[in-house]
């Protein structure tokens, strides 16, 4: 569960290393983001000489959370870290590679481009 002021690792090669959530997109009373939700975040750590710079405001989709994710078949999945992939206004990833496992639930939210770039889909 990601809420404002939560820090996330970046799971792509867009140039950002750490993000801090500043808003969960959706309805106005939404407090938490889960896997597959879009957030507005600020870049807190960045790689030098890359397109994304520190203190830049970006959109990102949450791909991994430490909070367990319940599936319809009764299985529960949780990851070791909170991670997100930086996206543009159309919902396409800004990076060209995705690192680490990605939850299968992203397919339900039409993030198929991120699924195709991921090395492992759980």
Swiss-Prot record:
Record localization: Plastid, Chloroplast
UniProt GO molecular function: large ribosomal subunit rRNA binding; structural constituent of ribosome
Classify the main location: plastid
**SMART domains, A to Z:** Ribosomal_L14
Q: Which Pfam families does its entry note?
A: Ribosomal_L14
The cellular component terms of Gene Ontology attached to this UniProt record, alphabetical and capped at eight, are: chloroplast; cytosolic large ribosomal subunit
**Family affiliation:** Belongs to the universal ribosomal protein uL14 family.
The UniProt subunit note reads as follows: Part of the 50S ribosomal subunit.
Annotated function: Binds to 23S rRNA.
Indicate what this protein is called per its UniProt record.
Large ribosomal subunit protein uL14c
Source organism: Angiopteris evecta (Mule's foot fern)
The uppermost taxa in this organism's lineage are: Eukaryota, Viridiplantae, Streptophyta, Embryophyta, Tracheophyta
